[in-house]
């Protein structure tokens, strides 16, 4: 039950009952009517701009229309008070009985409270991480991994049919560099002194096990082969080794994908899929042969001063047309992007989300143009860009580069502070904003550490049930009807907690609609703050404590409230991919 959806329906029924509105309904735009929390909580629990939206087309004074709507709202037995503010905002304060009824709904729903059918089963593909398989995951990959995974969880909770996908970039020139680097480690494993790693190769020690595995499998046979013979063998083995390492790194972060899509598959059979995708664009009139003028500034690697096969992307929203086939007949990197998007579209996805690093900002328009051209506008494409994460160690930023071998791995960060702090803190800023990761801050046991503060609220909730078991040893907490006891909840501070719980479905819906999972983390912190505040009031005033061994009925009712808080905390933490501990010491 979404409080705001519920009152939107009630207000719509009232509007339909007003003759002048009913008579002019076809001329009115009800979509602009909002039902939301008031900006100032002291004004009430629900606010609507209905009178301000409808007054002008009806030729009425907004305040007069607000008074008319407000008078009808005030007749609702679950409305305690209605007031009109400013030019015509209608503020509604709900009755205690409404909050009690809503608490019963939340308690019965448990961790499913806030789950919705917003997606209506629509198929959505979320592609994230997609790091080159050239080494272990570093902390720079971490944010996109967490944002993508949490977004996928959020969309699934909101009724979408979600596929989590990883695109393996295993067909580019970097793979040849990787293979040569692994071959060098193979020679080292055979006892050869390789000296310093040559410039341009990957120097990291993470390739030592790959070289040893090649030596175990092939002995000395690779060393006597020409490069064109050993290269495909080494490529295959080292890509498998790197992807196994990446999967382990992601598992340490509780990130799991449904599909791992290999770029090499697009190049199989003479690049048949790429050729088919370009033919499809050609049939739709989006491909031509021509020359592009040299762009201002630095020349992109796919620009040539000769005729190429081009995607007419400027006609579908891009800044410039994009090369697909070079003058020598080879495909550009973007041609593989075309084939990959077409593959997703052919798999029946209604929407594709790409979670990319901020350095991929230049790809946004070309991908959006590609989506319009291939789908004819029927498929939606969204690109989320994740800004950089800065790590500080001894006051100095840590350089991260696979090529130099000097980088902090994702696994090192997780091993040092734990999975939960990493996941939650990666969501505690909007993904489009830079994030500083403070090793000391994320392990503090204080309200200044959001993940501790939220998890501690859940642990406190569970401790209340242990206290109740001690206070009422004959009480079977597994069988009592906590929802049925909600009618005993009446204290204003308890109503404040129920009101905060009531916001959750709206927060989930807004976060899913805007593709912003950080909203869940922000909400959880706010809910934890209200709960901790109520807990502290109970320390000062015994009458407000959740468990009162002198009042069994009230204690059971308050257990229902605590159960509701714990359920929403656990639900939100699950979306973020963070655990909800029963105890914290």
UniProtKB/Swiss-Prot annotation:
This protein's UniProt keywords: Aminoacyl-tRNA synthetase, ATP-binding, Cytoplasm, Ligase, Nucleotide-binding, Protein biosynthesis
Annotated motif 'HIGH' region, positions: 131-141
Biological process annotations from GO: arginyl-tRNA aminoacylation
The reaction(s) this protein catalyses: tRNA(Arg) + L-arginine + ATP = L-arginyl-tRNA(Arg) + AMP + diphosphate
Enzyme class: ligase
GO function term, MF aspect, one: ATP binding
Sequence similarity: Belongs to the class-I aminoacyl-tRNA synthetase family.
Name the UniProt record assigns to this protein: Arginine--tRNA ligase
Organism: Sinorhizobium medicae (strain WSM419) (Ensifer medicae)
Gene name of the encoded protein: argS
